[in-house]
């Protein structure tokens, strides 16, 4: 099946908004085995939008339009598509009720007549409810071509796609089953090299590597009759892949950490903390609370995390954590001594089972004769205090901090897995 994505909005063409929806939708279509052959952006103009829809209908089986579902006159996606299909616009009962509920809590004057446009769908279409907004989406097939209309804001589009569109398309079109393997501690180029014979000779299942910031994923996909057969085929391939070794001789399984498109090192670590009923704290310098805010973003985080420290300066490390100032000056803040001291003191002061610390040089300048991207990560438990040094070179400050937190979560995850192996 050939699909085409059409982003509607003059603000995309003028560069005011980045079209992140295209990447998200392309990934979702790939998961379903639907090939996206074309991506188009068009302004808020009926004539040009009609032209784009006409072209897409001549070369694609599935046309997905994003944006232009709002209440204003320049929001004309549904109106233009309805005109092209020679269909009327009708009101969706559920969407109308949502409008009623929304405006019932506001001043009567706030409900202007143009808001009703958001509850309209093309006659004969399947409505796609909007859980986070007011503009309803829709799906319709006419003359063998399927059309989807989605809201533009990613906060509305993503839930609608994940919860409404993907299940709908899965039932109608897809026989593709996928499994995503996640890796940390190996680059895409080395992973592809190690698995080159599998990738070059792939037929079914297929293997697709993707580089993320600080990590790599492999999507394994197969077309088969049912989930049970897919699980068997993908499981066999996974076992073969993970039996390989890195160029340094390390088992590939050692740098594999989990499954799923939406998974993360932080989530894996959080779930292990919950599983083993362990608490954690952190003392952060260069990351300025990123580790802690990431951990706290998971529902139920209070089960494992009660608080921590952000000690950006040397003086605050001494004041808040009780580390000897003269020793800090002697060893420097970018050191194993400081990382281990921060982790241990954070653990002792909060009574947590595990203490983590991050200290280093975010860049772009050197600090204490250490290059940008030098990070020390400490970890303290009741029985052991240790640290690792990582060098995250050629990255922005934000990337250095983000990747440093990945290393910290991975360090905690490995510690918890050792505990798992002892049980």
Swiss-Prot record:
Gene3D superfamilies: 3.30.70.2860, CinA-like, MoaB/Mog-like domain. Signal peptide: none annotated. It holds the Pfam family CinA. Belongs to the CinA family. This is Putative competence-damage inducible protein. It comes from Streptococcus pyogenes serotype M49 (strain NZ131). The lineage of its organism: Bacteria, Bacillati, Bacillota, Bacilli, Lactobacillales. The gene is cinA.
């Amino acid at each position: 099946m050939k699909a085409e994505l059409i982003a509607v909005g003059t603000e995309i063409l003028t560069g005011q908004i980045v079209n992140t929806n295209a990447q998200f939708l392309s990934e979702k279509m790939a998961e379903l085995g639907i090939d996206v052959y074309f991506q188009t952006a068009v302004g808020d103009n009926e004539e040009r939008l009609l032209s784009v829809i006409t072209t897409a209908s001549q070369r694609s089986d599935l046309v997905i339009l994003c944006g232009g579902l709002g209440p204003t006159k320049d929001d004309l996606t549904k109106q233009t598509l309805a005109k092209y299909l020679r269909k009327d616009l009708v009101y969706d009962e559920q969407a109308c009720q949502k409008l009623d509920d929304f405006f019932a809590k506001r001043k009567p004057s706030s409900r202007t007549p143009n808001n009703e446009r958001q509850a309209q769908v093309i006659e004969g279409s399947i409505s796609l409810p909007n859980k986070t907004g007011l503009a309803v989406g829709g799906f319709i097939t006419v003359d063998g071509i399927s059309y989807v209309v989605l809201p533009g804001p990613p906060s509305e589009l993503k839930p609608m796609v994940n919860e409404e569109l993907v299940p709908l398309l899965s039932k109608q079109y897809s026989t593709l089953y996928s499994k995503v393997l996640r890796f940390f501690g190996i680059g895409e180029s080395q992973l592809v090299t190690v698995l080159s014979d599998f990738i070059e000779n792939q037929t079914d299942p297929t293997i697709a590597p993707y580089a993320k910031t600080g990590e790599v994923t492999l999507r394994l996909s197969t077309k088969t009759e049912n989930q049970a057969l897919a699980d068997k085929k993908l499981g066999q391939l996974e076992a073969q892949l993970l039996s390989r070794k890195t160029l340094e001789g390390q088992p590939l399984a050692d740098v594999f950490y989990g499954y799923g498109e939406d998974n993360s090192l932080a989530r894996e670590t959080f779930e292990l903390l919950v599983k083993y009923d362990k608490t954690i704290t952190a003392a952060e310098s260069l990351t300025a609370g990123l580790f802690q805010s990431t951990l706290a973003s998971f529902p139920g985080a209070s089960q494992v995390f009660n608080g921590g420290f952000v000690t950006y300066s040397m003086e605050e490390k001494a004041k808040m954590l009780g580390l000897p100032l003269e020793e800090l000056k002697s060893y420097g803040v970018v050191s194993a001594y400081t990382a281990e001291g921060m982790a241990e003191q954070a653990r002792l002061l909060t009574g947590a089972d595990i203490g983590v610390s991050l200290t280093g040089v975010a860049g772009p300048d050197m600090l204490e004769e250490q290059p940008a991207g030098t990070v020390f990560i400490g970890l303290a438990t009741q029985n052991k205090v240790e640290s690792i040094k990582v060098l995250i070179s050629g990255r922005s400050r934000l990337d250095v901090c983000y990747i440093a937190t990945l290393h910290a979560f991975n360090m905690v995850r490995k510690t918890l897995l050792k505990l798992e192996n002892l049980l």
